């Protein structure tokens, strides 16, 4: 079934809502852990759910290459394959193709590239992306687009955005032709150029989608540019449709996105950083492999209710990290994912209670930082 989005409340620019799917309800603003290959690295689905996650992100490109559509169909779909009972959003593969760099060739038809797994020549286009995502059983399907690189000239960004709009129409047409009962999101492109973002928003809303993502950010541009584009773009998006900021980010990036009207986020940062021993806490980041933690018998974060913080000390986590024990990476991941979900839960509660600005001030004060300004000067 198509998602139903209800905007329940706004407070100081932040939006409090609910996404309703056949497979469950997602409270927004929401953070989606990334399960690239059909797994959030090192976690069982039950462990991911216990952190507070209600929706996951799967990777169309990587799941197409391994295990492939036929294996997926043998199981039913991605939910059955990985035993995740909740909703799943899948990206279209556009960003992964963008990341291949010189090994890919982009044409009007689609993208030619070499399979990074075995070197075979393969081709992906809007129609193929829609077919793969239908086989995955994605609750939210993303259109196939080109992620505009940074830096890009105005002409380069314009050409890329216009092609993404044409691919958006092709994605919409093929999605409808397949009679896919789920939801399709458009992706706003245009680089750091406000006039191009305007054209992209206009074109996408004329086509019509179930939600709208802001893409092409967090690809190397200064943080000020990301904030500026969000402040310019979000007010133009339909108020009654969910807004998704792709591939972002640090905890403070989630807060800044919510301040600018974003409802949904995803990022590999909590899981990737966990495996590298960088752990998010109320005051900032702990690097658990630093020697000072060797004799520290306190938990990572006294405010945290995760399994790791309730049962283990920094000293033990430091020991596991220094020994390269798999358990260390797992415990770190549980903590980081729970920290992100706690941030989102606190954001939602503060909006419910009409005190979002106070939450933002407290969030930055705990890290010893000033609240970044909103507006063109930010």
UniProtKB/Swiss-Prot annotation:
Pfam families: TGT
Cofactor: Zn(2+)
Record text on cofactor binding: Binds 1 zinc ion per subunit.
Alphabetically ordered keywords of this record: Glycosyltransferase, Metal-binding, Queuosine biosynthesis, Transferase, tRNA processing, Zinc
List of residues binding Zn(2+): 304, 306, 309, 335
Keyword presence, Lyase: no
Any GO BP annotation: tRNA-guanine transglycosylation
Reactions that this protein is recorded to catalyse: 7-aminomethyl-7-carbaguanine + guanosine(34) in tRNA = 7-aminomethyl-7-carbaguanosine(34) in tRNA + guanine
Record-listed E.C. numbers: 2.4.2.29
Family stated for the protein in its record: Belongs to the queuine tRNA-ribosyltransferase family.
The protein, known as: Queuine tRNA-ribosyltransferase
Organism of provenance: Vibrio atlanticus (strain LGP32)
Gene name per UniProt: tgt
């Amino acid at each position: 079934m198509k998602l139903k989005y209800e905007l329940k409340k706004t407070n100081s620019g932040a939006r409090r809502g609910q996404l309703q799917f056949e497979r469950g309800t997602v409270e927004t603003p929401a953070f989606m852990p990334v399960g690239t290959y059909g797994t959030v690295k090192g976690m069982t689905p039950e462990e991911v759910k216990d952190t507070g996650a209600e929706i996951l992100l799967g990777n169309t490109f990587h799941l197409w290459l391994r295990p492939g559509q036929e294996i997926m169909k043998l199981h039913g779909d991605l939910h059955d394959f990985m035993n995740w009972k909740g909703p799943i959003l899948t990206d279209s593969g556009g960003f992964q193709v963008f990341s291949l760099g010189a090994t890919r060739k982009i044409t009007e038809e689609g993208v030619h590239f070499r399979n990074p797994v075995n070197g075979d020549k393969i081709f992906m286009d809007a129609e193929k992306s829609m077919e793969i995502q239908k086989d995955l059983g994605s609750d939210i399907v993303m259109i196939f687009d080109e992620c505009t690189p940074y830096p890009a000239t105005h002409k380069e960004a314009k050409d890329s955005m216009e092609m993404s709009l044409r691919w958006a129409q092709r994605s919409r047409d093929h999605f409808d032709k397949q009679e896919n009962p789920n939801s399709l999101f458009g992706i706003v492109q245009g680089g750091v150029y406000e006039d191009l973002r305007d054209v992209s928003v206009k074109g996408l809303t004329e086509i019509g989608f179930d939600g709208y993502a802001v893409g092409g950010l967090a690809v190397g541009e200064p943080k000020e540019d990301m904030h500026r584009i969000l402040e310019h773009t979000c007010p133009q998006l339909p108020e009654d449709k969910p807004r998704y900021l792709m591939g972002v980010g640090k905890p403070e990036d989630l807060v800044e996105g919510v301040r600018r009207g974003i409802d949904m986020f995803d990022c590999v940062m909590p899981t990737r950083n966990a495996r590298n021993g960088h752990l998010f806490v109320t005051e900032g980041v702990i690097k658990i492999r630093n020697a000072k933690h060797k004799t520290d018998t306190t938990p990572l974060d006294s405010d945290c209710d995760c399994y790791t913080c309730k049962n283990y000390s920094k000293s033990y986590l430091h020991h596991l990290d220094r020994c390269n024990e798999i358990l260390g990476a797992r415990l770190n991941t549980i903590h980081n994912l729970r920290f992100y979900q706690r941030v989102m839960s606190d954001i939602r509660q503060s909006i419910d209670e009409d005190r979002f600005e106070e939450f933002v001030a407290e969030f930055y004060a705990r890290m010893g930082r000033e609240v970044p300004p909103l507006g063109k000067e930010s």
